[in-house]
Regions:
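Catalytic Walker B motif of ABC-type/P-loop ATPase nucleotide-binding domains
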Residues: 156-159
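H-loop/switch region of ABC-family ATPase nucleotide-binding domains
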Residues: 191-192
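Conserved ABC ATPase signature
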Residues: 131-135, 139
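Helix-to-loop junction immediately C-terminal to a conserved catalytic motif
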Residues: 48
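The feature captures the beta-strand-to-loop junction immediately N-terminal to the Walker
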Residues: 33-35
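Helix N-cap at the start of a conserved alpha-helix in ABC-type nucleotide-binding domains
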Residues: 167-169
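ABC ATPase NBD coupling module
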Residues: 64-77, 182
Length: 214
């Protein structure tokens, strides 16, 4: 629930998400569609352990999970609609999260960076040393996705990943999502692009006013 700006009562709240149960499975792509304000992004933030639900429990492999569980939060990664990249090389951007997680071996960093770039359709020989200003919008999104794939997350969340990219990048992002699922990650994709998300998803649900309608 959030404060309701449409109400004159300063204490009034609006329920933006009201789910009884939703399973997310390893090795599967769960597609979530819905109009703006339907609760899609709120759901992703709860799954990403960025904010707690007001009621109910989020379970990870049968155990309660909370925002204070830093170990679990490192196993979940979120790709936003508008990617944020450092003003550095592509290699540095992909390596950043790996270094934060304590991976310092030069060979492992090199292998993970190369593999994740290939997974999103970017040739390391061409893109490794390019900087943010040398990339198109679609390439920036693919680099941001590569940085998350390099972490080998248990859960990969994607919030409108193709909203501002070209057709080629949208296709590459779909392939990368499938690769992540085939590698064992649970993948959750939010999109209002029905033509893109429908063939991609193993399961497809619709949110309407915070509730699952199908």
């Amino acid at each position: 629930t959030y404060p309701d700006p449409a109400s004159r009562d300063p204490h009034a709240v609006r329920t933006v998400l009201n789910l009884s149960e939703l399973d997310i499975r390893a090795g599967e792509i769960l597609g979530i569609r819905g109009h703006n304000g339907s609760g899609k992004s709120t759901l992703l933030r709860i799954i990403a352990l960025l904010e707690p639900p007001d009621n109910g429990t989020l379970l990870f492999e049968g155990r309660p999970a909370g925002t204070e569980d830093l170990h679990l939060r490192r196993q979940v990664t979120l790709l936003l609609q508008t990617p944020y990249l450092l003003s550095r090389s592509v290699a540095s951007n992909v390596a950043y999260g790996l270094r934060v997680r304590g991976i310092s071996s030069a060979s492992e960093l090199q292998n993970r960076i190369a593999a994740s770039l290939l997974a999103v359709g970017l040739d390391p020989a061409v893109f490794l040393h390019r900087r943010r200003h040398e990339l198109s919008g679609g390439e920036c999104q693919r680099v941001a996705l590569a940085a998350r794939l390099a972490l080998r997350p248990r859960v990969l969340l994607m919030d409108e990943p193709t909203a501002s990219v070209d057709q080629q990048s949208a296709e590459r992002i779909a392939r990368a999502a499938r690769h992540a699922a085939d590698s064992g990650s649970a993948v959750v994709v939010v999109s209002h692009d029905h033509e893109w998300i429908t063939p991609l998803s193993d399961r497809l649900v619709t949110l309407r006013e915070g509730k699952l309608v199908e």
